[in-house]
Structures are given as structure tokens and as C-alpha cells.
Amino acid sequence: MSDKRKETAVIVSQEALSKDIYSMWLETKETAKLAVPGQFISMYTNDGSRLLPRPISLCEIDKANARLRVVYRVTGEKTGTEQFSRMKAGDKIAILGPLGNGFPLEEGAGKRVFLFGGGIGVPPMLELAKQLDTNNADKQLIMGYRDETFLTEEMKTNGTLYIATEDGSVGTKGNVMDAVRENALTADVIYACGPAPMLRAIQKYALERSIVCYISMEERMACGVGACLACVCQSKELDAHSNVHNKRVCKDGPVFLATEVEI
């Protein structure tokens, strides 16, 4: 469970990685020191026009310098993410975090692991790959994109990288599961983050082969702390908070065992 707090962070740098994809480094007081792979932060716009913050996953964690890297997609004009993209080094931004539960690193210790990332689910796989270095995991990074790729050079330095693109412009033509089949890949443990159709296919693959699988779910979030129930997903267990079969993605997740949830 996260030890969350709200603070004012300072933007260290920002750059565009591809069309609509931006990378931002933040200097924090405490948030970076507490963060683990798979968690996220809520970022607030500065003009007060939007009451709800935007949840953004953590791409890299630099505890020594108390810095966090977020990589996010601009979702349209006059959106919170569009406002973030116009900010520059030295600007201040309010954040809440770290939020949610991260990936269990110990599950991959000394094993062959798949790290699946799809679309804006690619960024959190980078810090996970870096931290899995410490437990001798054999990492196979399988990243899926619609067309334009990003973060590939960083990924290559942290494992064996396989790429799938929908248009076939880079790597395997198709999706991440097509890349697994094309390269005859196998694994003992799976970590994944991405859109629901991708996670559903990975969940099915893992269950059929009795592979331990952790998935990070992407749901629209409002409060980010589990109070509003806007981001629930269906679960196989009775939730103690709502007394129904669901889980709050922001608080109980976003990382779940694939056997825990319905996608």
C-alpha cells in the first residue's frame, strides 16, 4: 500500500518523444523516495479549471536525486495533459503520490520473465526492467505500438527487446502476442501494462499455461485514492469496501494478479 502525500514538484526537464507523447522529469521532496515500479502519481493543472488531477504512471524513479520521470500522452486540446505539455523547466506542479500498489519484484527473481507494454502502458515497464536487474531475472521486453515507437533505446539497455507495431513498420506486424509467437518466446512470470484487449489476451495466455501473471490495469480514475469508486473493475472476490465483486483500480491496484480480476 502506498504512503501517499501531496506536494509541489519542480519540473527539471520536458521533451516530446513522438507525436503526442511527452517525457517530464520532476524533482520532488518525498514522493520519489517512496515510489516503486508500477505506481502512479496524480498531477494537478495550475489554472484551477479542472478539479480532478490526471493519473500518470511512473516511468523512472531516481531516489538518489529525489526525481521522477513521467511519460504521458496528450489526449486532446484544452485537456489537462495538453496543459502539462506546455510547461517548462523550472515550473512548479502539484502532485499526489505515490499511489496504488506496484509490481512484486520478488516474483521474477532468477526467472525468465515477460515484460509486456502496450501504448501508454510502455513507460512503467522501463523502471520495472531496471529494478529487476537486481534479482537476476532473464528479461524479455515485448512492447506494442500502433505505429510510432518511443523509449526503445532505454528498453534495449535493460533487457532483450521485441517490438510489435500494428502497421508492421517496426518489428513484428500485429500485437505483442504475435511477437511472442513469431519469436517462440517462453516465460515463467509475466508483468504487463496496457489497454484492456491486450491484457485480456495476456491473461488468457497465462492462465492456459499456468504462468504467474501480474497485470496493471488502465481505467479512468477520478479521486485516485479509492473513495469515489469511479475506476472499479470486476473481481472474483467480494470487496470489503463496497461489498460487491469489484476492485478499485487506483487503490487495490493498479497491479493485480491475473487470476484476481475479470478484464
Place the predicted regions along the sequence by residue:
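Ferredoxin-reductase
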Residues: 2-89
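FNR/FR-type flavoprotein reductase catalytic core
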Residues: 79-220
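Structural signal for conserved beta-strand scaffold positions within catalytic alpha/beta enzyme cores
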Residues: 13, 60, 163-165, 215, ...
